[in-house]
Amino acid sequence: MKNYHAPDEKGFFGEHGGLYVSETLIPALQELADAYKAAKNDPEFWAEFRCDLKHYVGRPSPVYHAARLSEHLGGAQIWLKREDLNHTGAHKVNNTIGQALLAKRMGKKRVIAETGAGQHGVASATVAARFGMTCDVYMGADDIQRQMPNVFRMKLLGANVVGVESGSRTLKDAMNEAMREWVARVDDTFYIIGTAAGPAPYPEMVRDFQCVIGNEAKAQMQEAIGRQPDVAVACVGGGSNAIGLFHPYIGEENVRLVGVEAGGLGVNTPDHAAPITSGAPIGVLHGFRSYLMQDENGQVLGTHSVSAGLDYPGIGPEHSHLHDIKRVEYTVAKDDEALEAFDLLCRFEGIIPALESSHAVAWAVKNAPKMGKDQVILVNLSGRGDKDINTVAKLKGIKL
């Protein structure tokens, strides 16, 4: 994998990705692609990006040896890449800082975003406040109900939260609505996509901004243990935290890469959000081609996950490509496994993880005991779980 290069000039990762949008959006995406290409080759752009990550986000985020959890499980040593310690509480802000700097460079005064768990909405509202832009966040009505703390947070930050009542009233529908709005106001509006999906150049751009995770982790693990981990694992919805960890490791052939999809109630039921593990066919959604949960007529299927942030029927195109070329293994953690991992991390390490990240922790919980004590698993702890305490309390029958 030493010579891995993707996407190609048309925005394809193998047979995934590309640009499947209405004519009206082509000029906007071309303008964005040109602006990003120029920014990518401008050292000053990256200097400003790094400066904000350091002084505003609080990077680098540490790697932490979860020694008590490792001892309890009795096997491999579990290390956590602590994205939960970033300003706003998750990895999302790495990307919103980058896109906001690009919006500023392009002279856009307004940003819009879609959000599922609310973390990307909060991160977008945060950077809009930071750079003096107006912000509208599109969010499915169901997600608004299960993520009230984040909805209030966005409003505190000055954003307008637009509830989406159409379809399944979740992330997919919020993304549809945001794209419609972008078509209508493309001149003054920048659309900050929150995951490594969407039409080109978004998957590449989001990956590049999130690669700070894996680049830091490589240097930090080398310093901490004198080598790289045996396995690097991350949860995958659209897949931005995972691609940020995986991409810098693609050339490290001794490092196994594992992406954990949302298994929901099981991939043998309709209630999950695991397109790759469930063997979903290729389809087109939100401007890109990738594995997509759909019925025999090509209608997008409903999804289920205990975590709002993984509740998405598609997956970023680069993940589909990495699956095709067998560089990354994709598997699932079910709701109950994620909840068990959530409890274990709380009790053994004093860290409340996001339910999304708990899916990656669940892989470590399941697999560490089968590995040697000298082996190392690096888990991307993509976010903190404050936003999820209502969901968890409800599932435990506790009224807050």
Curated annotation (Swiss-Prot):
Pfam annotation, one family: PALP
Pathway the protein takes part in: Amino-acid biosynthesis; L-tryptophan biosynthesis; L-tryptophan from chorismate: step 5/5
Cofactor: pyridoxal 5'-phosphate
One GO cellular component, as annotated: cytoplasm
Chain coiled-coil ranges: none
Keywords: Amino-acid biosynthesis, Aromatic amino acid biosynthesis, Lyase, Pyridoxal phosphate, Tryptophan biosynthesis
Reaction(s) catalysed by this chain's protein: (1S,2R)-1-C-(indol-3-yl)glycerol 3-phosphate + L-serine = D-glyceraldehyde 3-phosphate + L-tryptophan + H2O
Record EC number: 4.2.1.20
Modified residues (N6-(pyridoxal phosphate)lysine): K92
GO-annotated molecular function: tryptophan synthase activity
Major enzyme class: lyase
The keyword Transcription is annotated on this UniProt entry: no
Protein family: Belongs to the TrpB family.
NCBIfam families: trpB
HAMAP family referenced in this protein's UniProt entry, alphabetically: Trp_synth_beta
Family matches, as PANTHER family: TRYPTOPHAN SYNTHASE, TRYPTOPHAN SYNTHASE-RELATED
Function summary: The beta subunit is responsible for the synthesis of L-tryptophan from indole and L-serine.
Assembly and interaction partners: Tetramer of two alpha and two beta chains.
Name recorded for this polypeptide: Tryptophan synthase beta chain
Source organism of the structure: Neisseria meningitidis serogroup C (strain 053442)
